[in-house]
Amino acid sequence: MESQQLSQHSHISHGSACASVTSKEVHTNQDPLDVSASKTEECEKASTKANSQQTTTPASSAVPENPHHASPQPASVPPPQNGPYPQQCMMTQNQANPSGWSFYGHPSMIPYTPYQMSPMYFPPGPQSQFPQYPSSVGTPLSTPSPESGNTFTDSSSADSDMTSTKKYVRPPPMLTSPNDFPNWVKTYIKFLQNSNLGGIIPTVNGKPVRQITDDELTFLYNTFQIFAPSQFLPTWVKDILSVDYTDIMKILSKSIEKMQSDTQEANDIVTLANLQYNGSTPADAFETKVTNIIDRLNNNGIHINNKVACQLIMRGLSGEYKFLRYTRHRHLNMTVAELFLDIHAIYEEQQGSRNSKPNYRRNLSDEKNDSRSYTNTTKPKVIARNPQKTNNSKSKTARAHNVSTSNNSPSTDNDSISKSTTEPIQLNNKHDLHLRPGTY
């Protein structure tokens, strides 16, 4: 009876499993309470171990092993903190796994070893599921790109849709030198445009066409970090990343500003070398134009001294200003301000002389009326010619012959001379003269 009561009490307090063990131990004359207590302790240890295994299993898979990582770091060793990409601000697993990319599909598709300080960039999975790029991927910056030229299309015309018929988009080359960053960022912007991300690229005013999404920001950060190693970044880029390691948009905006500045510098140099001035425009406007160009070049690191500036200005002077080339050629220390004083003096003299001249311009109607009422009082000279020639007129040859004969025979009187001259003279077809024999 006592053993049956103990077995029932054991069954209620310790469960069916322990009750069966207790009933078995009754036949060996051992205390069933001691046995049940030991078995209960073993059950509790087993359950605690099982629970610990269940809780530790997801933790081990929280940071999956990266098949693309060349040399993964142990979890106990903290990654290095130097460089513009800090570990304490690393993106979460969800942020590092963007979806919906048509070309790369995901940053893990890029076949490059990630940074040692960022082991969470690439998700797990077999590498065969990601499309591979041609052998041209990862070529140096000097290798020509299949896209012709570095001309950028308008960001406003870029399609923000993530679907495309292209099989792949060639990624930008690896940056290998800080001096190559201006050329590299052009190819990187071209890569973003080909990836249907032209709308997030800053425009001329520094603002993008549309707002960037979280997945696009992650893709932008990952690709920039992979293809632009931190040791090859210029100092100004490192300064931006030291403040905000994800501010890639600011880097792109500053890069575009520098591109425009380089273009402006070239235009300013060409304009300064081809100056032309002849007084047709105000001297103040000409001086403002030239000084603004010189100040811009000096601020951008292209120093233009007074000697070079004066030579360029004087070479473009023409008209009355041309003599300034010779009056000042001996003054080696002449400044731009002194040269413009002479230009202003000539311009003011020109304006004063033009204002002092009276204006006698008459109306066109008055001139027409005067021309109609004007009469010519002087009689024109009229030369009257006799249309009928007499047959007894002599030619010059006959007259000369008569004069010669009259000189040879002075005894002949005037009547005989006049009589001989009144007789007709006959000419043959050869224009020879035939006189009468008596006249010889």
Curated annotation (Swiss-Prot):
Residues 1-16, 153-165, 402-418 have a biased composition (Low complexity). The keyword Cytoplasm applies. Residues 299-401 are annotated as: RNA-binding. Residues 48-60, 127-152, 419-428 have a biased composition (Polar residues). The record marks 401-402 as: Cleavage. One of its GO terms (cellular component) is cytoplasm. Residues 429-440 have a biased composition (Basic and acidic residues). Its main location: cytoplasm. The modification Phosphoserine is found at residue 416. It is found in: Cytoplasm. Coiled coil: none annotated. Induction: Ty1-JR1 is a weakly expressed element. Induced under amino acid starvation conditions by GCN4. GO terms for biological process: viral translational frameshifting. GO terms for molecular function: RNA binding. Capsid protein (CA) is the structural component of the virus-like particle (VLP), forming the shell that encapsulates the retrotransposons dimeric RNA genome. The particles are assembled from trimer-clustered units and there are holes in the capsid shells that allow for the diffusion of macromolecules. CA also has nucleocapsid-like chaperone activity, promoting primer tRNA(i)-Met annealing to the multipartite primer-binding site (PBS), dimerization of Ty1 RNA and initiation of reverse transcription. Retrotransposons are mobile genetic entities that are able to replicate via an RNA intermediate and a reverse transcription step. In contrast to retroviruses, retrotransposons are non-infectious, lack an envelope and remain intracellular. Ty1 retrotransposons belong to the copia elements (pseudoviridae). Homotrimer. The C-terminal RNA-binding region of CA is sufficient for all its nucleocapsid-like chaperone activities. This is Transposon Ty1-JR1 Gag polyprotein. The gene is TY1A-JR1.
